[in-house]
């Protein structure tokens, strides 16, 4: 669970930092951008001065520990010099660099023939969807060996370890086209997903994400523990496209609300609720199907309520206060804290303003459902705005959403038009609901 509140009832923003929890489920190369973000948070925007030298050094040490076993030799050597206060790194760094260079040369020689073949149109035109047949064709006509194919895999891994993600992606793709080793193919697919994320090639990342999901669902169906672990990892990796690529929003939300993944979140990583709640709340007005968005919002509320004993932060507490407790004062208080948390979160910083605006819409909608006449002064307090800003915000909302409401400037109120629902209309709505449920039951019995 998130840190307990302090004496004033609030926890410090740093207490809601999810870095350690996220890092446990990310590849080391994916953790690096999060550390870079944390380092950037310590720099004063106006002066460029680092506010906390001790914390900055701690982050530099974390970068070094993270990457020292990678093959990013030059960068790791620079980190060492920064930490040790020296100008030249020890000879071991140069030795490792030479060793890595030799490995790259060796693997490039081993793969040069097969790469050349895969770039020839006459060869590619003879390849089919049957990998076994493709290998037989290449062995027979071009003397390709399995060692050559596996060398593509090794070269892709080495390029990745060096931080050459584009080259690594290409090698792993070529390997996957030819290999019949299911375990290595699965590993290569995860590798390509990582590469596409790190190069911010979001469309390709989404294609690889779908492939990884299919592998988890099919290949691991008889191994529940492994399936849980892989789904946990994929859930964390999916945060990168979710908050950086607009077209990824709906398919990834569909993934997260899939029974297998929502169970994974609840059982293994409840902190993902922060990201799920933000994604759903900020999706208002964007969702292609408003009905699906409403269902997702209800599901978020339900899960936040169920998992309150396991995980809480200002974002989930905002949802709880507004949609479960109907405590508007607490919702506004948590919204202020939530904005601070979002601005210190790697994935959510760019969505902080959008979240606050969407959250205010939710507060306004909820408040209007139970009041016919609302004081502008009272509403401005609920929204966390001054009187003028609140009035402007409400005017824009009424105009943009065609809300059936008007502002009474003389009385300083917002007047809501809640047309009474006739008994006849209520009976019709209930009959429709009963008829639909009967259809669902009939269909279920027929199956």
UniProtKB/Swiss-Prot annotation:
A GO molecular-function annotation: translation initiation factor activity
SUPFAM superfamilies: Winged helix' DNA-binding domain
Function: Component of the eukaryotic translation initiation factor 3 (eIF-3) complex, which is involved in protein synthesis of a specialized repertoire of mRNAs and, together with other initiation factors, stimulates binding of mRNA and methionyl-tRNAi to the 40S ribosome. The eIF-3 complex specifically targets and initiates translation of a subset of mRNAs involved in cell proliferation.
Subcellular locations according to the entry: Cytoplasm
GO-annotated biological processes: formation of cytoplasmic translation initiation complex
PANTHER family according to UniProt: EUKARYOTIC TRANSLATION INITIATION FACTOR 3 SUBUNIT E
Subunit and partners: Component of the eukaryotic translation initiation factor 3 (eIF-3) complex.
Domain PCI: 253-421
Family, similarity comment: Belongs to the eIF-3 subunit E family.
InterPro entries membership: eIF3e (IPR016650), eIF3e_N (IPR019010), PCI_dom (IPR000717), WH_DNA-bd_sf (IPR036390)
Lineage of producing organism: Eukaryota, Fungi, Dikarya, Ascomycota, Pezizomycotina
UniProt keyword terms in alphabetical order: Cytoplasm, Initiation factor, Protein biosynthesis
Name of this chain's protein: Eukaryotic translation initiation factor 3 subunit E
UniProt entry tagged with the keyword Transferase: no
Gene Ontology cellular component list: eukaryotic 43S preinitiation complex; eukaryotic 48S preinitiation complex; eukaryotic translation initiation factor 3 complex, eIF3e
Keyword Lyase part of the UniProt annotation: no
Chief site of localization: cytoplasm
């Amino acid at each position: 669970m998130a840190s307990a509140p302090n004496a004033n009832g609030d926890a410090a923003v740093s207490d809601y930092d999810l870095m350690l929890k996220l890092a446990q489920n990310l590849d080391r190369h994916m953790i690096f951008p999060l550390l870079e973000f944390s380092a950037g948070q310590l720099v004063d925007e106006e002066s460029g001065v680092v506010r906390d030298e001790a914390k900055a050094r701690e982050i530099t040490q974390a970068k070094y520990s993270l990457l020292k076993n990678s093959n990013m030799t030059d960068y790791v050597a620079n980190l060492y010099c920064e930490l040790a206060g020296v100008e030249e790194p020890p000879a071991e760094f140069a030795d490792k660099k030479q060793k890595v260079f030799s490995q790259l040369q060796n693997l490039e020689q081993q793969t040069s023939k097969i790469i050349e073949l895969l770039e020839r149109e006459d060869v590619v035109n003879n390849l089919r969807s049957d990998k076994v047949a493709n290998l037989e064709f290449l062995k027979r006509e071009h003397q390709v060996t399995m060692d050559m194919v596996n060398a593509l895999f090794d070269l892709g891994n080495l390029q990745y370890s060096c931080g050459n993600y584009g080259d690594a992606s290409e090698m792993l793709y070529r390997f996957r086209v030819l290999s019949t080793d299911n375990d290595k193919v699965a590993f290569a697919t995860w590798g390509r997903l990582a590469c596409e994320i790190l190069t911010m090639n979001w469309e390709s990342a989404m294609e690889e994400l779908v492939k990884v999901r299919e592998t988890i669902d099919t290949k691991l169906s008889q191994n529940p523990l492994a399936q849980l672990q892989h789904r946990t990892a994929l859930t964390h990796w999916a945060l990168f496209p979710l908050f950086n690529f607009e077209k990824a929003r709906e398919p990834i939300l569909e993934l997260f609300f899939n029974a297998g993944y929502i169970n994974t979140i609840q059982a293994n990583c409840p902190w993902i609720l922060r990201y799920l709640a933000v994604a759903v709340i900020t999706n208002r007005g964007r969702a292609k199907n408003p009905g699906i968005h409403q269902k997702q919002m209800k599901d978020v509320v339900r899960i936040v309520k169920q998992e309150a004993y396991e995980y809480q932060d200002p974002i989930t507490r905002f949802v709880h206060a507004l949609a479960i407790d109907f405590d508007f004062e607490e919702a506004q208080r948590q919204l202020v804290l939530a904005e601070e948390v979002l601005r210190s979160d790697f994935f959510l910083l760019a969505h902080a303003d959008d979240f606050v605006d969407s959250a205010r819409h939710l507060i306004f909608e909820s408040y209007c459902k139970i009041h016919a006449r609302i004081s502008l002064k009272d509403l401005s307090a609920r929204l966390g705005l001054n009187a003028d800003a609140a009035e402007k915000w409400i005017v824009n909302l009424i105009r943009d959403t065609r809300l059936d409401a008007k502002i009474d400037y003389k009385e300083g109120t917002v007047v809501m038009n809640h047309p009474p629902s006739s008994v006849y209309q209520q009976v019709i709505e209930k009959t429709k609901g009963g008829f639909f449920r009967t259809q669902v039951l009939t269909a279920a019995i027929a199956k």
